[in-house]
Amino acid sequence: MSGPALTHIDSAGEASMVDVGDKAETVRVAVAEGFVRMKPETLALIRQGNAKKGDVIATARLAGIMAAKQTSSLIPLCHPLMLTKVSVDITPDDALPGLRVEAMAKLTGRTGVEMEALTAVSVACLTIYDMAKAADREMEIGGVRLVSKSGGRSGDYHRAGEMR
């Protein structure tokens, strides 16, 4: 069987942390996205700042940033990283209806930051759900995916059809 290999599996088929010691340090950036679909009334509550637990968007933004910094504690084979930047943008979308979440993680180092960006989006979405669940238990988290990455030996990646 040819094609891409799983980098976290050793020759014996066991899970193994990748040795990045010989890789060059380069600027690495990853962007991920996701959404929380909800009832229009729930979105209105959040926009007005009337959710029972407080400012949903600000809290979810902070939760996403904190989560990116803790990725190696949550995902077993991720390296602890010295992130230089994490941003989480949360945008209301009436057409969804709900909130769109985008995270960017950046560093200068020997391994990528895709998992950090994905973790930031995931935890921000979970925080939105937690803070608004009293008003809407039918919320749906979805669309969590890598949008783009740059830097490193494998080169740049941009999801087809995305302009970033």
Swiss-Prot record:
A GO term, aspect molecular function: cyclic pyranopterin monophosphate synthase activity
Positions with a binding annotation for substrate: L77, C78, H79, M115, E116
GO process annotations (BP): Mo-molybdopterin cofactor biosynthetic process
Keyword line: Lyase, Molybdenum cofactor biosynthesis
Pathway info: Cofactor biosynthesis; molybdopterin biosynthesis
Active site annotation, chain numbering: D130
CDD domains found in the cross-reference section: MoaC_PE (cd01420)
Pfam families (alphabetical): MoaC (PF01967)
Top-tier EC class: lyase
Catalysed reaction, written as an equation: (8S)-3',8-cyclo-7,8-dihydroguanosine 5'-triphosphate = cyclic pyranopterin phosphate + diphosphate
EC number, UniProt record: 4.6.1.17
PANTHER family named among the record's database cross-references: MOLYBDOPTERIN COFACTOR SYNTHESIS PROTEIN A
Quaternary organization: Homohexamer; trimer of dimers.
Function in brief: Catalyzes the conversion of (8S)-3',8-cyclo-7,8-dihydroguanosine 5'-triphosphate to cyclic pyranopterin monophosphate (cPMP).
Protein family: Belongs to the MoaC family.
Official protein name in the record: Cyclic pyranopterin monophosphate synthase
Origin species: Rhizobium meliloti (strain 1021)
Gene label: moaC
